[in-house]
């Protein structure tokens, strides 16, 4: 399947969604966005390492403008506690 999915929020929920999208071959391109860029980049590295035996996909830690052209945008960010 050739689809682009953006996940906004790289916390527990957002990172799990991104991992599931990658591991189940649901999307061919995933953009993970978080206010904490380092957090998003770390989660992307973990997902890439955890899905190394799957078909290659594009997964990046990005900015809001990288969401352009997404087929689906998932907002998993919430209010800071």
Predicted regions and their residues:
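Aromatic pocket-lining residues of Rossmann-like dinucleotide-binding sites
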Residues: 21
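Extreme N-terminal starter segment of soluble prokaryotic enzymes
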Residues: 2-5
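N-terminal Rossmann-like NAD(P) cofactor-binding module of classical short-chain dehydrogenase/reductase
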Residues: 71-76
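N-terminal Rossmann-fold NAD(P) dinucleotide-binding loop
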Residues: 14-15
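Glycine-rich Rossmann-fold phosphate-binding loop(s) that bind the pyrophosphate
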Residues: 10-11
């Amino acid at each position: 399947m050739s689809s682009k999915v953006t996940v906004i929020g790289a916390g527990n929920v957002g990172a799990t969604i991104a991992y599931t999208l990658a591991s189940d071959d649901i999307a061919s391109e995933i953009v993970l966005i978080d206010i904490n860029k380092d957090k998003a980049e770390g989660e992307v590295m973990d997902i890439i390492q955890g899905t190394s035996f799957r078909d290659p996909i594009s997964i990046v830690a990005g900015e809001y403008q990288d969401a352009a052209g997404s087929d689906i945008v998932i907002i998993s960010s919430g209010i800071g506690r």
